[in-house]
């Protein structure tokens, strides 16, 4: 398993990261623990979670359960120093957390304490803001995104306020580093600039959706990541399961994400299935597993810190892990580029 230091930090992470958002709904605690064990055996040291997990569905009854499942594993195995744990502070509008309050110096200490308690640890390696207070163009909002109602002065004041609170947590030893999620190129540069101007932890990562099917980061965000030493953590690298091919031809496997979410968060479109067919053709042409090909491709990107993938079975996990050592030839990369040009932005 390849390792690298994340962003400008000294935190070393595997280039594949184990996602956890189904632990507590689609997966039991025991299944989540088995996934952690298998991933660590394969060389993964990086686990991503969030206070709002699990999903499918998100509910007041289950919020925080995924962190609790990870915490049970931490307490049982006493291997905390072998794992880099990342979690997230929910953003404005998440009614199940602090009645939907925006992220601020008033919410950060309590949110961190809650995560620490559930994770049964005294520190979080990477603490991320799940989405910006000012809004985001992620999750298909890019099609009608309008930032004209944003207030720059309020945004700057918020960043200064939040960074002050985060710095106090760093000094307390409760978090090691700070990351962002569902953030834009402008937002990344402003967080970095404010941190340098007023003090506070500079962001080392941004967790955004990124896959063969969703490449919004290829231009401005990628340039920002490279120049600001902010590594991308790609979520949904399999396009919520579309790139596995299991949904082609109208199939909806029992217990699958599509069976629980009929449009996969806006990803189910006729053009999406056409794009998947093109990528499946590339995999078949070169004798590759499509899951491993998609994950390995993400890992080749020059701004990538780690590729976050999830699984609902050990069989799925083992297939995904096979992509960690896969090297894609120039011919494969050229065919993937051609498929992308033929099927850009399918959702």
What are these regions (language model features)?
Residues 6, 18, 32, 47, ...:
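Conserved, mostly hydrophobic/aromatic
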Residues 1-88, 106-109, 122, 171:
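N-terminal binding-site loop/beta-alpha segment at the start of enzyme catalytic domains
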Residues 42, 77-79, 118-123, 162-176, ...:
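A structural motif corresponding to the C-terminal end of an alpha-helix
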Residues 95-207:
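Glycine/proline-rich, positively charged
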Residues 14, 135-151, 224-282:
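Glycine-rich, positively charged active-site loop/lid region within alpha/beta enzyme cores that binds
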């Amino acid at each position: 398993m390849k390792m690298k230091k994340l962003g400008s930090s000294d935190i070393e992470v595997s280039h594949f990261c184990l996602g956890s958002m189904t632990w507590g709904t689609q997966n039991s605690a025991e299944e989540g623990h088995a996934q952690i064990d298998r991933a660590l055996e394969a060389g993964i040291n990086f686990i991503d979670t969030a206070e709002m997990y699990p999903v499918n569905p998100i509910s007041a009854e289950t919020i925080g359960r995924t962190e609790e499942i990870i915490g049970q594993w931490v307490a049982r195995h006493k291997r905390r120093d072998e794992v880099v744990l990342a979690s997230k502070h929910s953003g404005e509008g998440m009614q199940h957390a602090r009645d939907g309050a925006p992220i601020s110096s008033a919410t950060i200490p309590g949110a961190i304490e809650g995560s620490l308690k559930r994770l049964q640890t005294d520190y979080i390696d990477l603490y991320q803001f799940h989405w910006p207070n000012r809004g985001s163009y992620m999750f298909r909002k890019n099609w009608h995104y309008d930032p004209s109602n944003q207030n720059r002065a309020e945004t700057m004041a918020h960043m200064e306020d939040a960074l002050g609170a985060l710095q106090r947590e760093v000094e307390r030893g409760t978090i090691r580093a700070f990351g962002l999620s569902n953030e834009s190129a402008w937002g990344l540069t402003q967080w970095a600039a404010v941190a340098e101007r007023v003090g506070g932890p500079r962001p080392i990562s941004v967790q955004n959706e990124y896959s063969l099917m969703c490449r919004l980061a290829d231009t401005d965000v990628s340039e920002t990541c490279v120049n600001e030493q902010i590594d991308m953590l790609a979520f949904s690298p399999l396009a919520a399961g579309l790139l596995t091919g299991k949904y082609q031809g109208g199939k909806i496997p029992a217990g699958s994400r599509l069976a629980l979410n009929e449009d996969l968060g806006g990803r189910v479109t006729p053009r999406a299935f056409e794009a998947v067919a093109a990528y499946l053709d590339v995999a078949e042409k070169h004798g590759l597993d499509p899951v491993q090909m998609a994950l390995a491709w993400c890992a080749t990107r020059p701004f990538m810190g780690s590729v976050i993938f999830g699984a609902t079975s050990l069989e799925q996990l083992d297939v995904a892990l096979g992509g960690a050592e896969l090297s894609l030839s120039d011919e494969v990369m050229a065919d993937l580029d051609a498929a992308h040009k033929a099927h850009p932005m399918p959702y």
